[in-house]
From Swiss-Prot:
A double ring-shaped homohexamer of HslV is capped on each side by a ring-shaped HslU homohexamer. The assembly of the HslU/HslV complex is dependent on binding of ATP. SMART domains: AAA, ClpB_D2-small. Its main location: cytoplasm. This is ATP-dependent protease ATPase subunit HslU. Belongs to the ClpX chaperone family. HslU subfamily. Residues 138-159 are annotated as: Disordered. It comes from Alkalilimnicola ehrlichii (strain ATCC BAA-1101 / DSM 17681 / MLHE-1). The keyword ATP-binding applies. Keywords: ATP-binding, Chaperone, Cytoplasm, Nucleotide-binding, Stress response. GO terms for molecular function: ATP binding; ATP hydrolysis activity; peptidase activity; proteasome-activating activity. Disulfide bonds: none annotated. One of its GO terms (cellular component) is HslUV protease complex.
Length: 440
């Protein structure tokens, strides 16, 4: 689990997301509270439940990006899912309990990677020994003379220096279990997983011989030895524990399962049903998975939605009560667009410069050029649908279409994108509202 303070978390998010300070602060506090809870007296820990968050804001302002970046910072089991993918129990489609099953699988992968990282040195030594045994076989009986320890050490030294990397050897590897593809209707993933495991276990453990270079053999054998040193049963127990104590679920598009007041009765039956099915998970219940029972009492849920056609009050009252922290994200301004284009280390401007540089052509953006691109994006958003920062992708792609097409023929040249260049390539489209609706 991350031990970063709220201030450090916000600073890290600032590198990738412009503005939205209120949302960043709420998420940072929620993440820090996970750590704080683990520090209090054990008798009090079960009583401290997470304060779930509802993020409200138009599309393209950074709700999903905050979730993506949070996943990397959290170092905890994290899953991002769209609420629209699920249906009420009894209808065709995935039921909400599959969220927890997927979360446990993610946690097992995370814990296994950490465990294998811890035994890397032991695995590397074991892999070296296996390669040395192939190149310099040990004595098979007491009567045979064993190669001197000195020869083996000399060979080990050469191996570590990389002098034997290109030599080809034949190694015996564990064969991958036979893959069986089973097709099943949505919502039956648990059954198909169990059937696949059953078929894989039929064959038992088999080995196969492969010829490869020493360098490649060391890598493959190191992974195999690391997997051998890791206890799967311990991994599963630790993964379930992590899910119960530290996991975070990001529920996107929660507004799409709202039933609007003006719709009256009838309509989409499974919408409200999805909300009712989510209730036990968010409130705290026990979900059965193939790795054991998982309690959801201390899983943090962060829900988000644009709420264009509905309001947070259209959620069923019980679910509203389970999302006590409300954060409103602001629509982006021209100045925000300028910062989005220039400040992040992997901004759109830097991405296009790196792509065009591969052709030997230098792409340069002036300050007034970047501002003009931001103004065009904001203008198109205000005239047509406001899709936030995603509009920048469309505008930039249209602006640099000619350069991208002819970059291979412009090796050694420098192309400067200033305000005049932007007006020349996009001015007509921005003025013509009908064209901008379809093209930008």
């Amino acid at each position: 689990m991350s031990e970063m303070t709220p201030r450090e978390i916000v600073q890290e998010l600032d590198k990738y997301i412009i503005g939205q300070d209120a949302a960043k602060r709420s998420v940072a506090i929620a993440l820090r509270n996970r750590w704080r809870r683990m520090q209090v007296d054990e008798a009090l820990q079960p009583e401290i439940t997470p304060k779930n968050i509802l993020m409200i804001g138009p599309t393209g302002v950074g709700k999903t990006e905050i979730a993506r970046r949070l996943a990397k910072l959290a170092r905890a089991p994290f899953i991002k899912i769209e609420a629209t993918k699920f249906t009420e129990v009894g209808y065709v489609g995935r039921d909400v309990e599959s969220i927890i099953r997927d979360l446990v699988d993610i946690a097992i992968k995370l814990v296994r990677e950490e465990a294998m990282e811890r035994v890397q040195h032991q695995a590397a030594d074991a892999a070296e020994d296996r390669v040395l045994d192939i190149m310099l076989p040990r004595a098979q009986s007491f009567d045979q003379e064993d190669p001197s320890a000195g020869t083996r050490q000399k060979l080990r030294k050469k191996l570590r220096e990389g002098a034997l990397d290109d030599r080809e050897i034949e190694v015996e590897l564990r064969a991958s279990p036979m893959g069986v593809e089973i097709m099943a209707p949505p919502g039956m993933e648990e059954m198909t997983n169990q059937l696949q495991q059953m078929f894989q276990n039929f064959g038992g453990e088999k080995t196969k011989r492969r010829k490869m270079k020493v360098k490649d053999a060391l890598e493959v054998l190191k992974d195999e030895e690391a997997a051998r040193l890791v206890n799967d049963e311990d991994l599963k127990a630790e993964a379930v524990e992590r899910v119960e104590q530290n996991a975070i679920v990001f529920l996107d598009e929660i507004d799409k399962v709202c039933k609007r007041a003006e719709q009256g009765t009838g309509g989409d039956v499974s919408r409200e049903g999805v909300q009712r099915d989510l209730l036990p998970l968010v409130e705290g219940s026990t979900v059965s998975t193939k790795h054991g029972m998982v309690r959801t009492d201390h899983i943090l849920f962060i829900a988000s939605g644009a709420f264009h056609l509905s309001k947070p009050s259209d959620l069923i009252p019980e679910l509203q009560g389970r999302l006590p922290i409300r954060v409103e994200l602001e629509a982006l301004t021209t100045d925000d667009f300028v910062r989005i284009l220039s400040e992040p280390s992997a901004s759109l401007v830097h991405q296009y410069q790196a792509l065009i540089a591969t052709e030997g052509c230098e792409l340069e953006f002036t300050e007034d050029g970047i501002r003009r691109v931001a103004e065009v994006a904001w203008e198109v958003n205000s005239r047509t649908e406001n899709i936030g920062a995603r509009r920048l992708h469309t505008v930039m792609e249209r602006l640099l279409e000619e350069i991208s097409y002819s970059a291979a023929d412009r090796g050694g040249q420098q192309v400067t994108v200033d305000a005049d260049y932007v007006d020349q390539h996009l001015g007509g489209l921005v003025q013509d509202e009908d064209l901008s609706r379809y093209i930008l």
